[in-house]
Swiss-Prot record:
Entry similarity comment: Belongs to the ClpS family.
Purpose: Involved in the modulation of the specificity of the ClpAP-mediated ATP-dependent protein degradation.
Lineage: Bacteria, Pseudomonadati, Pseudomonadota, Betaproteobacteria, Burkholderiales
Any one GO biological process: protein catabolic process
Start and end residues of each stretch annotated as Disordered: 1-27
HAMAP family attached to this UniProt entry: ClpS
Composition bias type Pro residues, residue spans: 10-19
Cited InterPro entries: ClpS, ClpS_core, Ribosomal_bL12_C/ClpS-like
UniProt subunit comment: Binds to the N-terminal domain of the chaperone ClpA.
One Pfam entry name: ClpS
Annotated Gene3D superfamilies: 3.30.1390.10
Domain of life the protein comes from: Bacteria
Organism field: Paracidovorax citrulli (strain AAC00-1) (Acidovorax citrulli)
Protein name: ATP-dependent Clp protease adapter protein ClpS
Length: 122
């Protein structure tokens, strides 16, 4: 058995629930919402002190791979020497990992046990 509607449907369509309200012209009005994305987690590249790697080699590595001038490289090298470790720079995760690998490879080729790592900035 088929049932028929007793009254004809209204001619003005009603917007579905949750849809933006329509203005007089029948067009849909959308609101632009600005979305904020979180900045990427940053990582610091840390060089560790050892008793065998020459200070001059550490300075050269800081200049070559981290773009430090002679004075800044010397200051970081002294911090590494005196405190046991020092921050070479702060980068995104991929860049920090690349820098760590560059330092390790250069140290290995030169026959030095210099260690370098990256850790999240807190």
């Amino acid at each position: 058995m088929v049932r028929m509607a007793t009254k004809p449907p209204s001619m003005t369509p009603t917007p579905p629930t949750g849809a933006p309200p329509r203005d007089d012209g029948g067009s849909v009005v959308l609101e632009r919402r600005t979305q904020r994305t979180q900045p990427p987690q940053m990582y610091q590249v840390v060089m560790l002190n050892d008793d065998y790697t020459p200070m001059e080699f550490v300075i050269v590595v800081l200049q070559e791979f981290f773009g430090k001038d002679r004075e800044a490289a010397t200051q970081i090298m002294l911090k590494i020497h005196l405190d046991g470790k020092g921050v070479c720079g702060v980068y995104s995760r991929d860049v920090a990992a690349t820098k760590v690998e560059q330092v390790r490879e250069a140290a290995h080729k030169a026959g030095h046990p210099l260690q370098c790592l990256s850790e999240p900035v807190e």
